[in-house]
Amino acid sequence: MLTSIFSKTSQGLGIELNPDCVNIVQLQHHKQGPKLIACASIPLPEGVYEDGRVLDPEGIADVIREGLAEHKIKAKQVVSAAPLGEAVIRLIRLPAELDEIELRDMVLNQEAALYLPFAREEADVDFQRLGTDIDEDGIERVEVLLVATRKEVTEDYLNIFQLAGLDLKVLEVSSFALIRTLREQLLQFLTGEAVALVNLDVDGTEISIVMDGVPQFNRKVPMGTHHFRSALSRAMNLPSSMGAELLQGITIPLDSSSTSGGTDQNPSAVAILRMLGDLSDELRRSIDFYLNQGENLEVSQVFLAGPGAVLGQIDEFFTQRLGLPTTVVDPIESLGLQGSADDIPMVQRPALSVAMGLGLRKV
């Protein structure tokens, strides 16, 4: 699966799995930029995928097959992503004089075990050699990005796509796909200037602090749209099944009294403000943790993606709470997509940010 990174095709098929749906994106690569060939978001039945774990691989494969057939997608090679919460991502520094074979042996057979919260033999590990620098002792070091997942996670994804009649060529981490989607925007920041990528997903929020295109800090907070919907349903005394519909119509109040939880606020506003207030506190802790790792570190902007980023005025809410400019990701605009991309409603676009990044990766 890893060796295929170096073989390229002109089309990319990206498929993202989450507890609510399967997102499918097919892009055609042209010199003038990527063109959207197909895009679909197909709901998953309840109970097939929960808390980042696959419970019914055949059920998910059925949904994938139906989506491909409906949109007349013939491609068989696919790129997908494991959730950030299922991955271990570390930046490590090793002696720069190591050649490629020595570096590979040291990373995979010695260093990896030091950073894994589970046994090395239970892990699939990959790495990327980055640049070199001089450490405080005057020794030249090479920076290496180490990425690992449990083998059972990799096997779950391989099994699903095999059942769907597809060949999974690359399984990466969701935050890497989001970085790819935002590549052009990230290039506008100065060297050493970091941004926070926040993917408000279904079962949690993925936070990545990225500098020079490389994730420096990664964390998943167990607060996602599922929790928002449940809080709204409880506040309104309505069935949980109505939470998704309620969430789509929410606009976050921004006046100064809205954060106090006063009795003049309607129950839905109080519920969502409490959840978002807790989430912004967690994001602030993550940013502060990163800033405390060294001198002259800076986080300049926040990018919001995922299905939770469609809440009205959520960008302004986080701008106020964090004191940092905050932008909702529009992957169509970020990638300058041609084709039928304009037909995708704005309210659906942030949720496709990861899938678009997967489709952008050539295999």
Predicted regions span which residues?
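Active-site neighborhood for divalent-cation/phosphate handling
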Residues: 77, 81-186, 301, 331-337, ...
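Glycine-rich phosphate-binding loops at beta-strand->alpha-helix junctions
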Residues: 275, 297-327
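Glycine-rich phosphate-binding/hydrolytic loop that grips phosphoryl groups
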Residues: 180, 309, 327-363
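Small-residue (GG/TT-enriched) beta-loop-alpha framework at ligand/catalytic clefts
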Residues: 13-37, 74, 80, 139-246, ...
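Feature representing long, continuous alpha-helical segments
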Residues: 230, 270, 274-277, 281, ...
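Phosphate/pyrophosphate-binding loops at sites that engage ATP/ADP/AMP, CoA/4′-phosphopantetheine
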Residues: 64-77, 164, 238, 286-301
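Adenine-nucleotide phosphate-binding core of ATP-dependent small-molecule kinases
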Residues: 234-235, 245-299
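Non-catalytic, solvent-exposed interaction/assembly segments
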Residues: 1-111, 115, 155, 165-167
